[in-house]
């Protein structure tokens, strides 16, 4: 009787000990995925700022950290903060032009007889 109990107890003990490690491994993988998503988002935000010319200016380390913290908040928090800010300003909203312009306008057509500057001198169009 004890011979049958011993392997059964060992099997149950092995299941109990292996159970938390599997769930903790899943938690670690989810945490790693969230960290990777956050790093990718911050990299994307830095690239947008660089393409907009914002990184050519002098920024203090604290200002950059605050900017990244605000931009990495979930969208619901950002909308809630925007609503709070609009209530604080009396409901007025200042609109700004987006960095990623989807409105790609063709370049101006040059008039006949116009002159362009070339490094050797002026040339006609």
From Swiss-Prot:
InterPro entries membership: Somatostatin, Somatostatin/Cortistatin_C
Modification Pyrrolidone carboxylic acid occurs at: 25
Gene Ontology cellular component list: extracellular space
UniProt region (Disordered), positions on chain: 82-107
Transmembrane segments: none
Disulfide bonds: 114-125
Signal peptide (residue range): 1-24
Principal place of residence: secreted
Record's miscellaneous remark: Somatostatin II may have a different degree of activity or a different type of target cell from somatostatin I.
Family: Belongs to the somatostatin family.
PANTHER family for this protein: SOMATOSTATIN, SOMATOSTATIN 1, TANDEM DUPLICATE 2
Protein name: Somatostatin-2
Organism name: Lophius americanus
């Amino acid at each position: 009787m004890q011979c049958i109990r011993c392997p059964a107890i060992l099997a149950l003990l092995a299941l109990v000990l292996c159970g938390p490690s599997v769930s903790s491994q899943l938690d670690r993988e989810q945490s790693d995925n969230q960290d990777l998503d956050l790093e990718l988002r911050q990299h994307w935000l830095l690239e947008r700022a660089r393409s907009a010319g914002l990184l050519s200016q002098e920024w203090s380390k604290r200002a950059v950290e605050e900017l990244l913290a605000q931009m990495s908040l979930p969208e619901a928090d950002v909308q809630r903060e925007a609503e709070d800010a609009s209530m604080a300003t009396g409901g007025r909203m200042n609109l700004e032009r987006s960095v990623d312009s989807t409105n790609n306008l063709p370049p101006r057509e040059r008039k006949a007889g116009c002159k362009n500057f070339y490094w050797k001198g002026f040339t006609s169009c």
